[in-house]
């Protein structure tokens, strides 16, 4: 269930919407143990009936997903809703009881899950920011952080992303960058790289060239991957 609330600000030419959401769910029976499977709860699957995304598994028992979605849009000259400027969505799963058969990485094995959310800020037509996060039920620690930004020009695009997983979700931290350059109407040059911040080492470099016309698309790519082995010094 969801209930939308709206407000128009004609002076500042903006439109605000707030939508509380609720999913009440009950499934009888038992489930097989999948505690060792790597899964993660996010706002994208918060209101899904099958949050663990296993075809033969349904989480048993009574649970409630609660959250909200807030959006701010521009109003155009005719006061119709236009481009989105900012959005924030977050929520949590509350279960009747714990279930240790569910992967701890999802946090829905506990009665109160992590608070998960996503946010986007379109600064202008060229630059935007995205943020996905997970906060523990005590509101003290961020267990998951994913920040990304895209910068677009007429003949060039740049992107930067940062990801961190901690505690029950995982143990990762890396930075990934990419760029695309339009050389002319039919050719592009691309580059991206990923760096592991826990080991202070590069994981890969990609360099690509693409040729595109009305009936043909061809490309050349060079990829170099790196690895570490504790037995090799």
Give the positions of each predicted feature:
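Outer-membrane beta-barrel translocator/pore domains, especially the C-terminal barrels
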Residues: 1-210, 214-233
């Amino acid at each position: 269930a969801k209930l939308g609330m709206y407000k128009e600000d004609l002076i500042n030419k903006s439109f605000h919407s707030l939508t509380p959401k609720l999913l009440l769910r009950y499934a009888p029976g038992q489930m097989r143990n999948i505690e060792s499977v790597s899964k993660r709860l996010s706002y994208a699957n918060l209101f899904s009936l099958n949050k663990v995304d296993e075809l033969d598994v349904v989480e048993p028992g009574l649970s409630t997903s609660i959250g909200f979605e807030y959006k701010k849009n521009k109003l155009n000259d005719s006061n119709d809703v236009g481009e989105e400027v900012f959005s924030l969505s977050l929520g949590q799963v509350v279960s009747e009881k714990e279930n240790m058969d569910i992967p701890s990485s999802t946090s829905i094995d506990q009665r109160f899950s992590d608070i998960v959310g996503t946010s986007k800020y379109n600064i202008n037509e060229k630059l935007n920011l995205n943020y996905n996060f997970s906060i523990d039920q005590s509101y003290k620690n961020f267990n998951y952080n994913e920040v990304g930004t895209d910068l677009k020009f007429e003949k060039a695009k740049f992107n930067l992303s940062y990801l961190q997983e901690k505690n029950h979700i995982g143990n990762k931290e890396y930075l990934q960058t990419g760029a695309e350059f339009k050389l002319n109407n039919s050719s592009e040059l691309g580059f991206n790289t990923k760096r592991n911040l826990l080991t202070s080492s590069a994981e890969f470099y990609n360099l690509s060239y693409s040729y595109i016309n009305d009936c043909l698309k061809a490309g050349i790519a060079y990829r170099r991957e790196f690895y570490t082995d504790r037995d090799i010094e």
